[in-house]
């Protein structure tokens, strides 16, 4: 940028823009010089023009020309122009008039390098720099005065600008500078146009963009050895600008003694550059050099440390081959910012170790498998007593609280399993095939049919408890007698008591066994024998087989009777009440230990409600076992009674089914319809439009804001070639026309007189 500085003393310089004529005069002009009588109204004219376009990006200075139009003259370096024009150079002294209007001509270099700008920003920047008399270059050199970036990123140009102490500004700085020159106001400062730092690994506060003289000699005394020509070409200029020495080590050179010096930094090839290495010998040679460095407790310097050393102005932490990177600050900070993004999609809490999370998921699968296995327990008759005891115990532990789902507390479940293992039970691992069955839907038809009886067993638990307690008040007994109870509910309550007693019997983990069941069960007499035998497997297997056979008999009875038990007649109600009274009488006769022990029964009920999940004492287990034996006996009696009274079952009942009626429209594309519509013509095709989503809407038209204007990049060489070609064609046309005129010339022209 050209400017005229007053030579007499301090004063505001007058800056000149390219392509503008500045008139120097006393009145009504751009460059006013007042209080001087020797200055004319239009004393001189100053013009700044661009030089001829060159293909190279060498620094070209605009031409400043002065033309004298004054009365008393204009002097350049003491010589008078006398109305002529002259080009000025930096340092010339110009005197307007004969008095003290003296100025010094100076040229302020303006070479700008841009980085990470789009096409529109580059175009606006070129126009502003050309008006200011500067030059825009693509690569950083020593002559560069500014680096233009929209946001600061650590690039080679950024490192070079920091080393040279040049300001890094935004593109808006030069537009504001041009406005200030045109209006002759205070120029903007580069500090107010610093771009934002776009490096999360470094941080905004840690990066100082101001000029520091110590950066110019940051690499003094150090030698950087590059193993590839690409790295040497890219980072070599930055090292040289910082006062260091950049060398390229050839593959043929085998001596590595120069690499073990503490002032020699071997630049690491890196992951991306190692993929470019072509030959196997090149990779082996690089690995051998790195092995030599490791053997001498040295390390290779990554490319990023060259930039970090310039930014933080330290070669003790960065670019130091003797310092082992024990705390990778930049890498750790980068990883800490990338890590939460990937961990947000995880459903496992990060505070839980992976092993703990895996164990937790395994426990959930195990609980689901236990629930499915125990639901199918009623239709299975297994010979492995120990395994059935374990599964039944886990079912009891899960179902003891009705509001608890399948995923109960895993710790309590494991503790119960561990406790029961001390009683001599054998833990069998679940097979993978059973675990896979958890994901299958439970709406299978065979399983619904087999488990249909289990749906009734969970309903009558409260009634069962009410019937087992003989301490029920007279008012409750009267209400129960007045309320009709079908035969199915009695059978369900007895069967549910058998099922619950079987669960409690095998789930508590002791070896209490029923001694035997004589044939006197039908005559309301049962001998209960509680023993602690060491080998109870044969008797227990026999009892379980008997119970399973009874349950299968119940299922056959329910399946053979497709009746609606909720709509019973008066005869059914009377039979239910009589069965209920007989059952209570049988319970009163059969329970030997429960007679006279009402207080103990109340205490057992309190313990059962309060101590859920705890190991019951031996006395409680024996009482529960006695209750379960009574329930089994009642179930068998009711079953026999049901077989005896099968002839008295109600008949002539009405079966009600609810069906939803749906009006179905006839198909329009049937053959008969087509024949009638088309007047009986064969092979006549009818077509119709198939609706699709969005058929009634307007189509989406790409246009407007969706289109981006294509900005073609101007090619100066092509334009110049086209211009020269056009001039050449015009010249040839003129020559041809001149030749034609000479050919038609006739010296003997006859003129008419």
Swiss-Prot record:
PROSITE patterns xref list: FHA_DOMAIN
Keyword annotations from UniProtKB, A to Z: Cell cycle, Chromosome, DNA damage, DNA repair, Meiosis, Nucleus, Phosphoprotein, Telomere
UniProt function note: Component of the MRN complex, which plays a central role in double-strand break (DSB) repair, DNA recombination, maintenance of telomere integrity and meiosis. The MRN complex is involved in the repair of DNA double-strand breaks (DSBs) via homologous recombination (HR), an error-free mechanism which primarily occurs during S and G2 phases. The complex (1) mediates the end resection of damaged DNA, which generates proper single-stranded DNA, a key initial steps in HR, and is (2) required for the recruitment of other repair factors and efficient activation of ATM and ATR upon DNA damage.
Motif window: Nuclear localization signal: 461-467
Subunit structure: Component of the MRN complex composed of two heterodimers RAD50 and mre11 associated with a single NBN.
The record's note on its domains: The FHA and BRCT domains specifically recognize and bind phosphorylated proteins.
Chain intervals with Basic and acidic residues compositional bias: 517-528, 585-606
The name this protein goes by in its record: Nibrin
GO cellular component terms attached to this protein's record: chromosome, telomeric region; Mre11 complex; nuclear inclusion body; nucleoplasm; PML body; site of double-strand break
Places the protein is found: Nucleus; Chromosome; Nucleus, PML body; Chromosome, Telomere
Record motif FxF/Y motif, residues: 739-748
Polar residues compositional bias, start-end: 446-455, 490-500, 568-577
GO BP term, example: meiotic cell cycle
Annotated family: Belongs to the Nibrin family.
Key word Cytoplasm present: no
Residue numbers bearing the Phosphoserine modification: 274, 343
